[in-house]
Every structure is written in structure tokens, then in C-alpha cells.
């Protein structure tokens, strides 16, 4: 299974994470398929994500980890995936 998860970078006591697409059998910091962005918790939650690539990978079947899913919700990735899969909600115009 392909997962979207965080891989740790940075120095000791200065964590920095990449958001990567990886085979679930690989190690946490092992080889990955593609990097989608980064997350720096020390700089007030500095986050950068390639939203289009993230949506593509989720539509292909990649499963985000719990932490990555929360980050994606902040950027509207999960909402965009839902709209593509199930269509936008039509507003009721009954008058």
C-alpha cells in the first residue's frame, strides 16, 4: 500500500519533516517515491504542500497518515478530493 506520511529531517532537537509518498513497508526515513512538501513545527507550524500532487496521489489510492490528514484538512486537500470523487454539493434553490 502507498502511504503519504512524514519523514524526519533536521538536527537533534530541531525536527523538520518532509511530507512524502512512500511504500508502507519502507522505514520512516527510507527511500520515498515523491516529496509533496514540508512541515517545520519550530517556525509556528510552517507548512508548504503541493496541493495538486497531493490530490492526485490520494485519488490514485494513497492513504495519508493521521498527522498528514490533519495537515491536508487545513489546506483543503481532503475537501477537494471529496468534491472530485462525489461532486460538489448543489445548493437548494427552492423558492
UniProtKB/Swiss-Prot annotation:
Alphabetized UniProt keyword annotations: Ribonucleoprotein, Ribosomal protein
UniProt GO BP: translation
Signal peptide (from-to): none
InterPro entries: Ribosomal_bS16, Ribosomal_bS16_CS, Ribosomal_bS16_dom_sf
GO cellular component: cytoplasm; small ribosomal subunit
Keyword Oxidoreductase part of the UniProt annotation: no
GO molecular function ontology, one term from the record: structural constituent of ribosome
A matching Pfam family: Ribosomal_S16
Organism superkingdom: Bacteria
PANTHER family documented for this protein: 30S RIBOSOMAL PROTEIN S16, SMALL RIBOSOMAL SUBUNIT PROTEIN BS16M
Family to which this protein belongs: Belongs to the bacterial ribosomal protein bS16 family.
Name of the protein: Small ribosomal subunit protein bS16
Protein species of origin: Thermotoga maritima (strain ATCC 43589 / DSM 3109 / JCM 10099 / NBRC 100826 / MSB8)
Gene behind this protein: rpsP
Amino acid at each position: 500500500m502507498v502511504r503519504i506520511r512524514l519523514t524526519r529531517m533536521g538536527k537533534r532537537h530541531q525536527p523538520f519533516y518532509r511530507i512524502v509518498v512512500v511504500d508502507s513497508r519502507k522505514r520512516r526515513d527510507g527511500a520515498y517515491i515523491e516529496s509533496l512538501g514540508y512541515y517545520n513545527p519550530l517556525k509556528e507550524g510552517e507548512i508548504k504542500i503541493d496541493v495538486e500532487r497531493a490530490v492526485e496521489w490520494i485519488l490514485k489510492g494513497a492513504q495519508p497518515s493521521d498527522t498528514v490528514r490533519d495537515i491536508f484538512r487545513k489546506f483543503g486537500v481532503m475537501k477537494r478530493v471529496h468534491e472530485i470523487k462525489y461532486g460538489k454539493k448543489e445548493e437548494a434553490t427552492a423558492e
